[in-house]
Structures are given as structure tokens and as C-alpha cells.
Amino acid sequence: MRINVDKYLFIGRKKSEFFSACRELGAVEFLAKNKLKDSENVRRISEGLKTLNLLTNKYSPSDLVLVKSGYLTTEQLLQEIFDLNHEITTITDSLKALSKEIFRVKPLGNFSSEEIRELTLKTGLSVRFFYKKHIEGAPLEVEEENVFYLATAYNYDYYVVIGVVSLSKDIFTEIEAPRSVGELREEEEHLQTLLRKKKARVCELYAYREELLEALCEQCNEQTLQHAEASTEDLFDDKVFSALGWVIVDRLTEVEKLCNSLGVYLERVQPDPDEVIPTYLENHGLGALGESLVNIYDTPASTDKDPSLWVFLSFFVFFSMIINDAGYGLIFLATSLFLSFKARKQVKHSLALKRFLKMFMILGGGCVCWGGATTSFFGVSVSYTSPFREYSLTHFLAMKKAEYYLKERPKGYKELVHDYPVLKDKKTPKEFLLAQGTSSGDSVYKAVVYDKFTDNILMEIALLVGVVHLSLGMLRYCRQRYSSIGWVVFMCGAYMYLPIYLQAVSLIHYALHVPYELGGQVGYYVTFIGLGIAVLGGIIQRGLRGLDEVTAVIQVFSDVLSYLRLYALSLAGAMVGNTVMVMSERFSPAVGVLIIIFGHTVNIALSIMGGVIHGLRLNFIEWYHYSFDGGGRLLHPLKRVICQKSQNI
């Protein structure tokens, strides 16, 4: 829920004691003059902590030391971490350069650079190395004196030249080789030994990670306290301070008690006209999960009702409908339970991880329920007479629709009988549903009526969910937007009238027993009544400008139709799952299992992407349009950061 926040003026003497007490209370956000910037100490500690955290990705758990080898101050620890990190980087770069140099001079063989220098000093003869392009079949030896062939490598011929020899620069290229491959390998071995020592030491410093984390928390607390104190205005030769701050209304009593104990005067003041009042949300249970989703897109304004619970429940329904597979839901459920057990220590100290796993578990349960209601399980075709199908929601509604068709004989019934004459003799809903036939271009016999009915039912459920979802949002916001009531009436009337206009049968006819002709006529008039109420509400609220409310009819229609994505995405996932199962049957069991695993893995990934993106989109775009202002900013009260120690790896 959203808790109101009021602006207060504080005047007192004991500035340090007051701000320290407010930090412990965590109910006041002080209006700072400048934006909070991390101090040099905070940046250094954060960088050092980041370096230690990255060790878990570079080294195995057995390499990291968890027992401290001695006492180190924070500054000593940071300096050693930075020095070691710099040295490791430098040595690693040197090893890469050495590796390239070894590769370059390897064809020259082993020689002593010291002996070459002595030879040059004693005789004055230089020793140089050259290479030329290797030509297959050409002689390797060179006719020039004091030019000796060494080796052929990398499609080049290598030579050593003693003394001054005139070689064609068009053919030969000199290669600098101050050290031989053997000398380079000795240096490489030395650097590798040094690198191992440095890495071993930095792994030992991992044991000090908790101390560094505590130091970071302490520095952050001190930094925020100083920043809050800097927001005050000193009066009467710095003997009195004044400060402005936002106070959580539900905790005003605690703030007043604190002020009385320190002799601080507080008075409520009005916010500036252009000032953004911060938003404070406080949720528990499912509402807390919804709050995490709400913060992804935008922050509610201070005038908004908290949409957290609404968003989560809607997302739960949308995600379940898009996944539309009980098998996938079982995988989500099992995975969340396994991770909750496997990472139970981390869950205790990570609120975000705890919320994610809880949400994943609930969504998995929703997918199981909706997949069971639509008889969808890993894309497997369920028999029309299976008990699993007979107790499903789609089967129940299909039976109701078949019963209505046989009783009322609407236009849709006549079209089906014309296309499938075998239906003419069917007297019971079950016989009518399960009658076998072939579709155009298809030679496989199947219950065509059953498939048509279930597809239409799922599509209409998606539209019905859209109407209900938008109506709830409009009613929730009707005090801020008077026309919302009219649009709710308009959508209800349109839902009753459109089946008559399209000469189709709707859920309201065979499930809710709304008379076909009468319901359509009532819906026709209710549609225009709702449109009139919407325009009237707009005029009452905005004057003559409210006449443009009539143009919103297109927006309302398009928003309702946007919910068809629930049906389209679920149908796409079901078709992919079914295709995977059909393909696997054409191969051997071993290959078939691989196809099933790969195909369903890809389908699950795509389904999750669609469920998350479109499940949230229907909330943030369609629903927010009628029930959300947004543009707010979260309240950040001054409070002490409590260091949560992580578990040992």
C-alpha cells in the first residue's frame, strides 16, 4: 500500500544527535541542497570489494581461502588488493607478450645471447637473423658466404648471417632476436611462478571480504549522515539549525517523540507548487512481489493508489495463460523448489532472491493450473475421451456450447452442418463434439467441432480477461477520471452486442444463459449509454474539452483487442510443443529424446520471454493508461545500512 508523506520543518540545537537518531529511526528524508556523491573512501572500498567478488568467477571454491591469516586495517587491505591486482594484470600482459615473442623466434632455435655479444666484442662480427618467403622446390641454401640456413616454419625460411653480407632487401627481411627461445621460456617460467604466488595471496585476501563489506556499510552510513547534516541551514552563529524533510505519516508519532526528547521543534509545511512529493510503498506478501514488478517500469505518483497487488495478480494470470502448459509449469515449480532448497542460506540474506524464487514458484503453480484447465501438457495430444480432458475447463465450456447449438440451432450450427454433414444426426452434446471429420486440405480424421470450439473459447476468454482487467482499472481510477464509468458500461454493452452483430455465439449465451436476441438489443443501447456517460463525465471534469472523449472509443477497442496476444502467444507455444513431439516420433528413441529436450528447452525460453514481456506490457501500457499517473520518485529516508554478511561459498 502507498503511505502518505508530508513535508516538515525541523528547528533545534543538537544537530548531530538529531540526525544520528533520525538515521536509526529511518522515517525522514531530508531535502538536500546537493546530490549525494560517493566519497573517495566509498569508491575505493567498492572497487576492492568488487575485485574480491570477481574472484569467485576466476577461481574454484577450493582455491579461495576462508580463514584470515592475520590482522589488516582497511587501508592496508585495500592497498594490497590494488597492488596485487595491478601486478597480476601486468604479469599476465607480460606473459601474453612473451608467448607471442616465443612463437616469433622459435624457428631460430636455441642460442646464447650472451655468447653472441661476446663474439661481437671480440671479433667485431655481428650476428643477425633473416627470413624469406618459402618457395616449394627452391634450394634452401644461399650462395652467399656466411649465410646459414636454420629452419623452415610458418611458410618462411630462416637464416643466420655472420658479419657483413649483402642480401637483397626485396627477398630477405631482418628479424630482431635479442633473446633466444630458451631464454624467453626461462623468463616465462619465472613469471608464471611469480603469478601463482600473487594469485595465491589474493585468494588469501578473500577471507577479509566480510570486513571490507562492513567497512563499506560503515562508510556509506557516515557519508549519508554527513550529506543529511549538510542539508541544514545554520542560524544564530551556528547555534541553531533548521532542516526540511519528508516524513512518513504512519511514523509521525515516532518522529515527534524523537524531536521532543532532543528539544527539536517540528512544523508541517506545504510543498512547493512544482515540487514532486516522494512516494512511499510498504507491501508484504504478494504485494511485495508486485512492488518489485511495478518498480521495473515507473514509480507511482503521490496521488496514485498502490498498484502492486493488482499488477502481480494480473501478471500471474497473463503469464499462466501465455505459457499455457502444465508440464512447463511443473518444471518451473520443481526448479523453484530445488533452488529454494539449494540456495537456502543465500535466500535468508537476499530479499531480492527470496522474492524471485517465491514469484517463480507461484507462477509455476499458475501454469500448472491453467495448463490443466486447457489440457495442455508438453504439447502431447490428449485423447478426446480422456478423463484428464473431461474434467478440464475447455471441455466443460465446449459441452455447454454444443448443448446450446443443439438446442437453439444458431447460424453457426447451420454452417457446421453444411460443412460436415455427419453432424446432422448427432443428438447429444458429446456426440456432436466428438464427431470425426476432416478439414479442408487435411486427410486426418479428428473431432473438428471440438477443436474449433476450444480455439474459439480460448480466444474469447482472452478478450473477456481484457474487458475485466480494463474495467477494474477504470473503476479503480474513476474518482480521478469521471469518464471511466461510462467506458466500463460501454465495454459491457459492446461485449453483449458484438456477438449479434457478428452472428456468433458467445460465452455469455451458453455459460451465463443471457438471451441471444434480447442480450444483443440491450447491449446495443447500453453501448451508446456508456458512450454518453463517458462524454458527460469528460465535460463535467474538463468542460467543453471533454467532448473529445468520444474519440477514445478507438483507443478502448484497440486496448481490448490487444489482449488477444494472450491467445496468440499460448497458441504459438502449443503448436511448437506439439511439433516437437511429432518430429521426435519420426526418429529413433535416442534421437527423439534429444529432439524433445532441445525443442522444449527452446520453446520454454521463448514462452518465458513472451510471458514476461507481454504479461508486463498489458499492465504497464494498456492498464496503466486508465489507472496510473506515474512520474513519481521513491522516498529515500535517512537510515542506517545494515551489513548483510554473505554465506561462505
From Swiss-Prot:
Alphabetically sorted, this entry's keywords are: Cell membrane, Hydrogen ion transport, Ion transport, Membrane, Transmembrane, Transmembrane helix, Transport
Which compartments is it annotated to reside in? Cell membrane
Q: Which InterPro entries match?
A: V-ATPase_116kDa_su
Gene Ontology CC, one term: proton-transporting V-type ATPase, V0 domain
Report the membrane topology from the UniProt record: Multi-pass membrane protein
| Molecular function in Gene Ontology | ATPase binding; proton-transporting ATPase activity, rotational mechanism
- Give me any GO biological process, just one: vacuolar acidification
Listed transmembrane segments: 312-332, 360-380, 455-475, 485-505, 520-540, 556-576, 593-613
**Disulphide-bonded residues:** none
The family line of this record is: Belongs to the V-ATPase 116 kDa subunit family.
**Which NCBIfam families is this protein grouped with?**
PRK05771.2-5 (NF004431)
Q: What functional role does this protein have?
A: Produces ATP from ADP in the presence of a proton gradient across the membrane.
**What is the protein named?**
V-type ATP synthase subunit I
